[in-house]
Every structure is written in structure tokens, then in C-alpha cells.
């Protein structure tokens, strides 16, 4: 806690407060020519989109400047990482500037689809002298501009503040999701005893989630020509859940993308029954949505584990620095061994996330009103990962302050 009161950390924290204030202010600016009184209907029909937007710094409840949030940007980063992991595609050989341009173009494409799908399904006001096409174009442009403004804001926060894009997402989650959970508790008329039990099990799960988040598997590492009688090994740490809570957050967003496409097609074919059924089946509470959600979490957890712990890079780095694992040749043998260990923990972590995020969501098949309560474990996983990420950043920034000068 002392680290937080260091001048550098306080300065960064104040900058972050300013950026958060700008974000909150922008989220209150409603889109022009939108019938705000009729937005509630869209929110009721698009619960999946509401939660997906909230997990990416967006807000579909008020249809504001930042309604689609960072979803296009974060989705493009994920897709790009999937491509760059494979050396065969050659994307990792591109210059950083070329990679950034391609990511931004991908962000623009995703933002255009999401913005257009939302605007075309918004209840728009009739304004004399202003055509519907002009209103659609203007609001689509505003939403895309809002996304790029948020990207710029998170870049500023990364360089001047704390947490980068994490802070925007955390503020979005804190602003809306606890309120939704409390409304569900009131709507379901849950008794104080059941509420106390939910609170107790939530605390138990929070403790378990923190343990799993920080749990690591250590591989002893030797270094050529270094002999230390006090410490025989250094270690390569591999987290048990290497993906963290990111797969749950990204899964909600990726599962919502098909809905945006269907909403876009529905505007051009409003009487198409298949499109309407597709939107309903992909909404929260449907079996197709549930299966797709869990499958996406499993795949993302597996993928993130190999992205976060790249066996190729680790093996190459160890070979260059003269490090080796006992009874293994440097190079290919080391790479295969690390890849095997990462694969094992990737499966364990993916299974853990599916159980944590999936089992509580079974409540929605009893009553859709349990949906918000069923999402509590998943929200805990996401939030814990964000908190520890900020803590690690603060620890890194104050690392030099832990050593005292000799003179």
C-alpha cells in the first residue's frame, strides 16, 4: 500500500482520474436525433449486446458517444494476435508501423459493422429538413469516432496514467453491472438468508479465484558457467491459468458479433423470419448462445495460454543466454517440453474457466432473471485479473524505490 503514495504513482493516478472523468462525461453525451424514451425496448431485446458493450467500456443503455466502447479495437488485437502467433503467415516479420496500420484498419471494419447495425435499429426522431440517411450516416460516424477517441484516451492513460485500457473497462463494469445485479435481487425478491449464502459463497469463490490467479508452476533453470552455492536454480514460471479472466470478457464480445451481423441484415429484410429467430437464439438464455459462449471461452483460454507463454520465444531466449533445463538439450527439445507443459495447463485453465463461467449460467434455464446473478463468478474472474494487472504495474514502477543508496 505504501507504493501507492509514491510521487510517481500519485501523479499517474491523478492523470487516470482525469481520463476517467473524460470517459464518464463522454458516456453521458447522447447521440443526436435518437428517441431516448424508446431505447429501453432495444435494451430489453439486446441483453447480450448490453453486457458485451459494458465489458469493453461501452454503454448501450443511453446510446452515447462511447456506446460501442473499445470492443472493435480489442477484438482486432485478439484477431491479430491469433495471426501473428504462427510464423508461417509471416505477419510477425512486418514492421511495427505496418502491423499497427493493419490493426487499425481491422478496427475500422469491425467498428463500422457494429455502429451501422446499432444505428439502423435505433428509434430515430423525424426531423424536418434532415433525411433518415443523413441521421444514420452522422450517428455511425459519431460512434466510430467515439471508439477511436477511446483508443487515443487509453494510449494516453498507458503512457501517463495507470492501467491503460483496463481502467476504462473497470469503470464501465463498476458503473452498470453492480446496479443490474441489485435490480435482479429486488426483482427476484431473494430472502435475506439466501442473499447471505450468496455473499458467503461469493467470498469463498473470490478467495479460490485469487489463489488460482496467482498459482504458478516452476520449471528449474540452469545457467552455463554460473555456480551459486546459495541458490542452485532460477525458475521459469508458468501460471496455472495462463489466460486469466480475459477469455470470459472476449467471449461475451465475440459471441455478440453474429448478432450485429443479423441486426444489419434484418434492416434490409425486416420480414425475414430466419433472421429474427437467429437473433433470438443468439440472445442470452438460449441454448445456442450458451453452447457458443462456453465453446468460445474454451478456445480463447487455450489460445491465450499459448499467446502469453510462447514456447518458441522462450526456447530461443534461453538458448541465446546460455540457459537450459535439466536433462534437456537447448533449442527444439526445450521448446517441445515447454510447449507440452503450457498445453497441459492451457487445458486445465480452459476447463476451469468453462466451469466457473458455465455452471452458474445454468440458472438462466430455470428463469432468465437469474442471468445477472449467474454472471457474478465470471465478473469476479475478469475483475481480479484487472486488479492484479494494475498491482503488477505499480510494483514494476516502484521497483527501484525498494533499494536504498549505499551513500
Swiss-Prot record:
GO CC annotation: plasma membrane
Localization per Swiss-Prot or TrEMBL: Cell membrane
Residue stretches spanning the membrane: 13-33, 65-85, 104-124, 133-153, 158-178, 192-212, 248-268, 287-307, 345-365, 370-390
Key words of the record: Cell membrane, Membrane, Protein transport, Translocation, Transmembrane, Transmembrane helix, Transport
Membrane topology label: Multi-pass membrane protein
A GO BP annotation: protein targeting
First-listed, main subcellular location of the protein, grouped into a coarse class: membrane
NCBIfam families for the chain: acc_sec_Y2, PRK12417.1
Subunit architecture: Component of the accessory SecA2/SecY2 protein translocase complex required to export cell wall proteins. May form heterotrimers with SecE and SecG subunits.
Family: Belongs to the SecY/SEC61-alpha family. SecY2 subfamily.
Function comment: Part of the accessory SecA2/SecY2 system specifically required for export of possible cell wall proteins. The central subunit of a protein translocation channel.
Protein name: Accessory Sec system protein translocase subunit SecY2
Amino acid at each position: 500500500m505504501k507504493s501507492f503514495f509514491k510521487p510517481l504513482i500519485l501523479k499517474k493516478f491523478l492523470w487516470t482520474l482525469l481520463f476517467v472523468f473524460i470517459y464518464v462525461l463522454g458516456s453521458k453525451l447522447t447521440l443526436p436525433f435518437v428517441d431516448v424514451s424508446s431505447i429501453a425496448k432495444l435494451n430489453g431485446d439486446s441483453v447480450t449486446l448490453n453486457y458485451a458493450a459494458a465489458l469493453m467500456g461501452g454503454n448501450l443503455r443511453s446510446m452515447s458517444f462511447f456506446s460501442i466502447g473499445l470492443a472493435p479495437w480489442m477484438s482486432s488485437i485478439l484477431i491479430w494476435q491469433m495471426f501473428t502467433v504462427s510464423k508461417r503467415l509471416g505477419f510477425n516479420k512486418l514492421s511495427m508501423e505496418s502491423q499497427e496500420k493493419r490493426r487499425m484498419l481491422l478496427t475500422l471494419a469491425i467498428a463500422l459493422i457494429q455502429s451501422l447495425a446499432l444505428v439502423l435499429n435505433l428509434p430515430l426522431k423525424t426531423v424536418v429538413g434532415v433525411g433518415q440517411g443523413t441521421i444514420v450516416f452522422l450517428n455511425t460516424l459519431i460512434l466510430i469516432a467515439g471508439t477511436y477517441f477511446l483508443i487515443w484516451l487509453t494510449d494516453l492513460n498507458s503512457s501517463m496514467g495507470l492501467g491503460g485500457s483496463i481502467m476504462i473497462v473497470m469503470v464501465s463494469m463498476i458503473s452498470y453491472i453492480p446496479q443490474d445485479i441489485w435490480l435482479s435481487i429486488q426483482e427476484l425478491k431473494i430472502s435475506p438468508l439466501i442473499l447471505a449464502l450468496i455473499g458467503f459463497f461469493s467470498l469463498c469463490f473470490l478467495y479460490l479465484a485469487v489463489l488460482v490467479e496467482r498459482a504458478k508452476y516452476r520449471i528449474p533453470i540452469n545457467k552455463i558457467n554460473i555456480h551459486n552455492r546459495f541458490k542452485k536454480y532460477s525458475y521459469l514460471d508458468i501460471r496455472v491459468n495462463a489466460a486469466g479472466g480475459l477469455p470470459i470478457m472476449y467471449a461475451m464480445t465475440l459471441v455478440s458479433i453474429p448478432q450485429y451481423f443479423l441486426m444489419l441484415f434484418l434492416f434490409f429484410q425486416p420480414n425475414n423470419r430466419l433472421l429474427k429467430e437467429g437473433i433470438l437464439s443468439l440472445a442470452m438464455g438460449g441454448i445456442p448462445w450458451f453452447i457458443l459462449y462456453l465453446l468460445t471461452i474454451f478456445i480463447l483460454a487455450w489460445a491465450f495460454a499459448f499467446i502469453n507463454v510462447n514456447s518458441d520465444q522462450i526456447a530461443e531466449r534461453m538458448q541465446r543466454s546460455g540457459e537450459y533445463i535439466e536433462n534437456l538439450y537447448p533449442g527444439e527439445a526445450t521448446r517441445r517440453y515447454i510447449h507440452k507443459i503450457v498445453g497441459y495447463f492451457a487445458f486445465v485453465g480452459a476447463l476451469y474457466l468453462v466451469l466457473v463461467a458455465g455452471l452458474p449460467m445454468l440458472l438462466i434455464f430455470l428463469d432468465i432473471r437469474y442471468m445477472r446473478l449467474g454472471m457474478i463468478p465470471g465478473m469476479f474472474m475478469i475483475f481480479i485479473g484487472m486488479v492484479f494487472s494494475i498491482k503488477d504495474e505499480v510494483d514494476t514502477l516502484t521497483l527501484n524505490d525498494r533499494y536504498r543508496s549505499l551513500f
